[in-house]
Amino acid sequence: LLSILNIWPETAFLGVYPRDKSVIQELSQRFLNPNKNEFLFTGTISNYENNYYNSALLLNSKKEVKNIYSKNILVPFGEFVPFRKILPRFDFFENKIDFSSSYQINPIAINKYYKFVPLICYEILFSNLIFKSLDKEISLIVNITNDAWFGNTIGPIQHFQFAKIRAVEFGIPVIRVANTG
């Protein structure tokens, strides 16, 4: 059975799951063919028990969320402020809400033949996240990212170089989708 995987970058969809479930279902309806075995993997924010996560959803063409992955390794001062609770008087940072870490990584199955390891943003730098999934017969590494905050620096190029290193290191194809190209 042929499966089509569409991949959007980290910040392509700014809704919050499950709060914006109807909007997420509309994404499936607008961008996936209901007569085909199509999937959309896209970045989003998720909220569970008053914790926010930098996440990615796998939607199918039947408007269902088939899987959700939440980021394990957060960017300090970008996604959380270290020691915020210990040093509250130094609370001069713009982001008032910290993202939470997931602490788990499981490959996402597209069908019975293909599984991929999802990585968000700079998680591609940490090979231990991939090592945890090697025994689960993964066929692909998918890295979605928003490199726009790097601006006109060498950052996006270095980030891309790490993705290439992971492909060589593990002998597994890496698909990297960035909102800046």
Listing of model-derived features with the role each one plays in the protein:
Residues L1-G181:
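Enzyme catalytic cores with a strong preference for nitrogen-chemistry domains
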